A protein has these predicted regions:
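Loop-to-transmembrane helix entry/capping segments in MFS-fold secondary transporters
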Residues: 46-50, 138-151
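C-terminal ends and interior cores of transmembrane alpha-helices
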Residues: 64, 84-106
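Hydrophobic alpha-helical segments of secondary membrane carriers
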Residues: 14, 54-55, 87, 115, ...
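Intracellular juxtamembrane helix-capping segments at the cytosolic ends
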Residues: 123-139
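Glycine-rich segments within core transmembrane alpha-helices of 12-TM secondary carriers
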Residues: 144-169
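Central cavity-lining transmembrane alpha-helices of secondary-active solute carriers
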Residues: 25-29, 49-74, 90-94, 159-163
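Helix-loop boundary and gating motifs at the non-cytosolic
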Residues: 1-60, 109
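Helix-to-coil boundary motifs at intracellular loop junctions of multi-pass secondary transporters
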Residues: 37, 76-77, 133-137
Length: 175
C-alpha cells in the first residue's frame, strides 16, 4: 500500500480526467446536442429528452445490478488497477465514437443514445475500481482527505473542460 503524495496525486488525476465524461457528455454538451439537435429529426409522440431518459434509465438499472458484481470480481482476482484501465480505455473509445453522431437522420439519435448508455455503464464499472483503490492510496487517518482531494480534482477538471468547450467550440457557433 503506497500512500505517498505522488501515488495519491496519480490516483486523483483519474478523477480529473474522467470529469470529461460526466461534465461534457452526460450533463452539459453532448446530451443537449443529442436531444435538441439530433433528436429534432425524430418522428415520435415522445420528446427526445424522454426517449434519452428511458435509455439512460435502462443503463442505470444495469449499473445497479452488475457494477457490484464487477467490483467483487476485481477485488477477488486482485485486478482493480487493470480493470480500471480496461474499462477506461473502452469508455474513451466510445466517447470518441460520438464524434460520428450526425444530426441528419433519426437513426443517429438512437446510435448516440445507445453509445451513451453503454459508455455510462462501462464508465461506472471503471469508477467502481477507481473508488475501490481508495484504501490502497490512503490510510485510516487520511482517507477522508485523500477522497476529498480526488473529488475536488474531479470538479476542477470538469470546470476547466467546460470552459474549454464553451470558449473553444460552443461560443464560436453561437456568435
Amino acid at each position: 500500500m503506497r500512500t505517498d503524495r505522488g501515488t495519491v496525486t496519480a490516483w486523483a488525476l483519474w478523477d480529473w480526467g474522467s470529469a470529461a465524461f460526466n461534465a461534457v457528455l452526460v450533463t452539459f454538451i453532448f446530451s443537449v446536442y443529442l436531444t435538441d439537435s439530433v433528436g429534432a429529426t425524430l418522428d415520435s409522440r415522445f420528446t427526445p429528452t424522454t426517449l434519452y431518459g428511458w435509455v439512460m434509465a435502462v443503463a442505470g438499472v444495469l449499473i445497479a445490478v452488475v457494477a457490484p458484481l464487477i467490483g467483487q470480481r476485481a477485488d477477488l482476482k486482485g485486478t482493480r488497477h487493470r480493470s480500471l484501465g480496461v474499462w477506461t480505455f473502452i469508455t474513451i473509445g466510445l466517447m470518441a465514437s460520438l464524434f460520428f453522431v450526425r444530426n441528419d437522420a433519426p437513426v443517429w439519435f438512437w446510435v448516440g443514445a445507445v453509445i451513451m448508455a453503454v459508455a455510462s455503464v462501462l464508465f461506472e464499472f471503471a469508477e467502481v475500481n477507481y473508488y475501490a483503490q481508495l484504501n490502497q492510496v490512503s490510510t485510516e487517518e487520511n482517507v477522508g482527505r485523500v477522497s476529498g482531494f480526488g473529488w475536488g480534482r474531479g470538479y476542477a477538471g470538469g470546470i476547466v473542460l467546460l470552459f474549454i468547450c464553451d470558449f473553444g467550440f460552443v461560443a464560436g457557433e453561437c456568435g
